[in-house]
């Protein structure tokens, strides 16, 4: 039985700034490739929760892997749900159901309420 195709949409991510190398006469500027990560967002949340606490680069790397993993799981599950219901669009409803299926008990409840709050804030700002 063929497995449903997994969608991997590229989320908008912010991270380290591009660094330019020193320029010689006649040379064109070469920019270093951007490494996308969730590090600035993880850092912002850390400062909201614990303003006096820092984070090591190794811990940040672990957090980045964690966020990427959870994103892929939720996106995959939401894609499957849309496919089962013969829909071609992943809506907030599929995301919410995917979160309920993937996260355990109280964690799912909190995630759903925070997600609902974020969607409400977004739609009211439009």
UniProtKB/Swiss-Prot annotation:
The keyword Mitochondrion does not apply. GO terms for cellular component: nucleosome; nucleus. Residues 1-35 are annotated as: Disordered. Its main location: nucleus. The modification N6-acetyllysine is found at residues 6, 13, 16, 21. InterPro entries: Histone-fold, Histone_H2A/H2B/H3, Histone_H2B, HISTONE_H2B_site. One of its GO terms (molecular function) is protein-containing complex binding. The modification Phosphoserine is found at residue 15. Keywords: Acetylation, Chromosome, DNA-binding, Glycoprotein, Isopeptide bond, Nucleosome core, Nucleus, Phosphoprotein, Ubl conjugation. Residues 13-34 have a biased composition (Basic residues). Belongs to the histone H2B family. The nucleosome is a histone octamer containing two molecules each of H2A, H2B, H3 and H4 assembled in one H3-H4 heterotetramer and two H2A-H2B heterodimers. The octamer wraps approximately 147 bp of DNA. This is Histone H2B 7. It comes from Gallus gallus.
